[in-house]
Amino acid sequence: MRKQATAIWTAWAALLFLRCAAWAEDRKPAWTLGLFVENDVFALSDGGYTNGVKLVWVSSGLGDGPGKGRVPRWLDTMSRKLTPSRTPDRRRFVSVALGQSMFTPEDILRKDLVRNDRPYAGYSYAALGLHRATPASMESFELDIGIVGPESFAGDIQQFLHRVFNWSYPEGWANQLKDELALGVAYDHKWKVLPAGKAGEGNWDLITHAGGMASNVFTGAAGGIEFRLGRHLPDDFGTALIGPGGDSASLFDGTAPRLPGRGNFGFHVFAALEGHAVARDIFLDGNTFRRSHRVDKLPFTVDIAAGIAVRHGRLKASLAYVYQTKRFKGQELKPLLGSLNIAVLF
């Protein structure tokens, strides 16, 4: 089973690399490669949602006719059916992502099962996103497939990194959730409330969003708001955390660049608030079809983020600190983590 999982994830990574290399041959219009890294080490802690990594490729704007986009014909056809461009200012995009998330109890030095804390859990996944956007709003549809459990290799990776960097060694991964195939669909809608002008116009804006996901990993709804203030605000839809629809933060098109003129410089600070209504969370509720450790999750949670973003030429980077309310009953510490996002236009 371990060899089969290795082959599957290697094939996914190779496919992503080869397709990106092929699409890069034609530089007009442009596409974007984004890297999301979230870790509690930025907040000098270790436990809870301890690490998340996501590599995202986002296409350029696709044409309305079959085969006009720089993606495989079947994917372009799917995008046209699910996200039709009915108005001249509406553009379609496709995204492909590979990601992994890790969860541990606060005391990672214990080898026994920590019954009053969340279970060890790892999740590795691939995601296909279809997006349609106007200058003032964007919709995202996403399909996720992955695996929870030892075959996600999250435990192996954390133990390896802690050994290499001589950090406190996580001893309890033998108690992690069992292997489970993960399938899910998600929807997210973002709106630029004020102002919704052309790229680079104005020194501030306000972005709201609402959406939800249905899967055996996570089922629930979310909504939030982000305020941005700075110089030459980018023509995108905010700085997202890892999650369904988060790929859209990397959307970047040569016909509507985040900044007027690729050599210009811009920066801004931002603050965001997001609330969640949680029906299911496998990382707290435990495995869906097998007995495993679980805790009593809280049905409503909140994330508060603040950070800074800079953009120069083809590169955009942002760094945020995120405060999370407690996720389950009896949780002693409120989670803190840092979120780094780097996006490059090709």
Description of each model-found segment:
Residues 25-65, 93-108, 278-284, 297:
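Short glycine/proline- and aromatic-enriched beta-strand/turn motifs that initiate or cap beta-hairpins
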Residues 112-116, 169-175, 211, 290-294, ...:
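Extracellular loop and loop/strand-boundary signature of outer-membrane beta-barrel proteins
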Residues 33-39, 94-102, 143-149, 208-216, ...:
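Transmembrane beta-barrel strands of outer-membrane/channel proteins
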Residues 47-53, 120-124, 139, 179-185, ...:
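Residues that define the transmembrane beta-barrel architecture of outer-membrane proteins
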Residues 106-110, 226, 232-346:
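Outer membrane beta-barrel transmembrane domains
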Residues 24-30, 61-92, 133-140, 193-206, ...:
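Short loop/turn motifs that connect adjacent beta-strands in outer-membrane beta-barrel proteins
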Residues 77-156:
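Long, hydrophobic/aromatic-enriched structural stretches that serve as scaffold segments
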Residues 57-59, 100, 130-132, 189-193, ...:
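Residue-level signature of outer-membrane beta-barrel architecture
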